[in-house]
Amino acid sequence: PGLAQADSHPVLCVSWNDARAYAQWLSKRTGKRYRLPTESEWEYAARAGSVTARYWGDDPVQACRFANVADQSRFQTWGFGQKHECTDGHYFTAPAGGYSPNRFGLYDMLGNVWEWTEDCWNASYAGAPAVATAWLSGDCAQRVSRGGSWSTVPRYARSAARNKNPADHRDNLTGFRLARTFE
C-alpha cells in the first residue's frame, strides 16, 4: 500500500468487490453469514446511541483519544494540510483497537480507514430505505464508504461523513469491516 503495515493494522487497498468476495468466502468457510454492513447499520454502530457529530461528542480536539486521523503527527511528517489540533502518534494507519471504543464497545469507527458499506451511492441520504436495508438504487457503479481514515481532516471526522468510490477502486485509505447476520 505504499506505507508500513503490520498484522495488527487494518486491511487496505481492497475494493468493494474484494470486500464482498471475502465476505462470501468467509461465509462459505464458516457456515455463518458475513456481509458488508448497510450504510444505516454502519452509522448506527458508529454513533452508538449518540446524537453528536462524533461518538465522543462535538469537539474534534478529542479525536486523538478515539481515532487515528490527520493530526499533528501527520502534519509534522508532511508539513502541509489541514489537521486536528492533537497528536495521536500515527501518521499512517494505526494498529486496530488502539483508541478508546465507542459506547457499544466498537473500536476505530472513525479514522484509520474508510470502510465500505453495501449501499449504492446517492448524493443525499434523505429518502434512504429503512434501517438495515441497503440502498440498492442510485449510482451503483459508485459505492459508499464511511468513517474517514488516517488522512481525514477535522470536518470529515464525524459519524455522518460519507464518501464514494467505484466498486473496483483500491487505495491506501480504504478497507472494510464485516457484519454478521444471525438467523
Name these PLM-found stretches.
Residues K164-N165:
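Short, positively biased Gly/Pro-containing turn/loop motifs at secondary-structure boundaries
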Residues N172-E183:
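Short, structured beta-strand segments at or near domain termini in extracellular proteins/domains
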Residues P1-A161, R170:
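Functional-site microenvironments in short loops/helix caps that host divalent-cation chemistry
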